[in-house]
């Protein structure tokens, strides 16, 4: 089984890779897809990828969906690309597993 995230137990932070599809009919988190041996969670966002609107939409949607504060979610890689790396701060690994396992099929 692939590791679907990287967790730092000292900082209580996690890195998750997402593959974003903008212009979606609805915001939706899909299952994982493997690209170049790296797992990405599929994410459809209604927002357009202009002037950071899609990135803001990603943060807002994930925070709401996963019941996290928006300030705890940060895009750290791929600001202008569909493949992104998300940093989640102040998260317990057990809660992270609960979130992630919902999307593993």
Curated annotation (Swiss-Prot):
Cystine pairings recorded for this chain: none
Pfam family, one: DUF167
One GO cellular component term noted in the UniProt record for this chain: cytoplasm
InterPro entries reported in the protein's UniProt record: DUF167 (IPR003746), YggU-like_sf (IPR036591)
SUPFAM superfamilies hit by this protein: YggU-like
HAMAP family per record: UPF0235
Family to which this protein belongs: Belongs to the UPF0235 family.
Name of this chain's protein: UPF0235 protein RP839
UniProt source species: Rickettsia prowazekii (strain Madrid E)
Lineage: Bacteria, Pseudomonadati, Pseudomonadota, Alphaproteobacteria, Rickettsiales
């Amino acid at each position: 089984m692939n590791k679907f995230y990287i967790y730092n137990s000292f900082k209580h932070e996690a890195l998750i890779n997402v593959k974003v599809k903008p212009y979606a009919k609805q915001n939706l988190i899909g299952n994982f897809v493997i690209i170049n041996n790296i797992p990405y969670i599929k994410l459809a966002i209604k927002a357009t990828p202009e002037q950071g609107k899609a990135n803001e939409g990603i943060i807002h949607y994930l925070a709401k969906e996963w019941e996290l504060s928006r300030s705890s979610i940060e895009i750290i890689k791929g600001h202008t690309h569909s493949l992104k790396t998300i940093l989640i701060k102040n998260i317990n690994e057990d809660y992270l597993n609960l979130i992630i396992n919902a999307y593993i099929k």
